[in-house]
């Protein structure tokens, strides 16, 4: 057996093309394996690219949905704040009207009454300032064309001097809150005469 082992150890192929063919076959098999692996990686890359595009699309839709949600929530919050303010201010306006009427009718006769009148004037200006800070503005009605969205016609009279319905007197002041009608003005309206 020792002799067989020696012969196997010393065995060298006689034909050099045999070694070259074996190397070529190994290289071809190795190249085929590389090509198969490249094809596999390309397929995985393609799948990952599709998944990435899908996730990017979902992300974009999600961000748009969130932005719409944020805008809707802000709009609802603003509407609620407006509603609460409008309700409170509608309750306060009659008090303000009465204060204004009392202020207008007060005719001080002596120094003491004059001081009291001046105090009322200061409170009135402060009250008016608070309303303005809250976004309340008085409507200008007299001389304006009648607008049923802003005016409530209490009285009507025919007049030759007008070509369209026009507000000629204001019986109760109207107010706006953030450019929306808080309370319509109660007005007297002049309408064109029937023959004109």
Curated annotation (Swiss-Prot):
Its organism's taxonomic lineage begins at: Bacteria, Bacillati, Cyanobacteriota, Cyanophyceae, Gloeobacterales
Q: What does this protein do?
A: Participates actively in the response to hyperosmotic and heat shock by preventing the aggregation of stress-denatured proteins, in association with DnaK and GrpE. It is the nucleotide exchange factor for DnaK and may function as a thermosensor. Unfolded proteins bind initially to DnaJ; upon interaction with the DnaJ-bound protein, DnaK hydrolyzes its bound ATP, resulting in the formation of a stable complex. GrpE releases ADP from DnaK; ATP binding to DnaK triggers the release of the substrate protein, thus completing the reaction cycle.
- A Gene Ontology cellular-component term: cytoplasm
- SUPFAM superfamilies, alphabetized: Coiled-coil domain of nucleotide exchange factor GrpE, Head domain of nucleotide exchange factor GrpE
Primary location group: cytoplasm
The record, for Pfam families, names: GrpE (PF01025)
Q: Where is this region: Disordered?
A: 1-24
Record's subcellular location: Cytoplasm
Per the record, the similarity remark reads: Belongs to the GrpE family.
Q: Name one GO molecular function term.
A: protein-folding chaperone binding
**Matching InterPro entries:** GrpE, GrpE_coiled_coil, GrpE_head
- From which source organism is this entry? Gloeobacter violaceus (strain ATCC 29082 / PCC 7421)
One record GO biological process: protein folding
Q: What is this protein called?
A: Protein GrpE
Could you tell me which cysteines form disulfide bridges?
none
| Subunit structure, interactors included | Homodimer.
What the entry lists under Gene3D superfamilies is as follows: 3.90.20.20, Head domain of nucleotide exchange factor GrpE
Q: Which keywords are on file for this protein?
A: Chaperone, Cytoplasm, Stress response
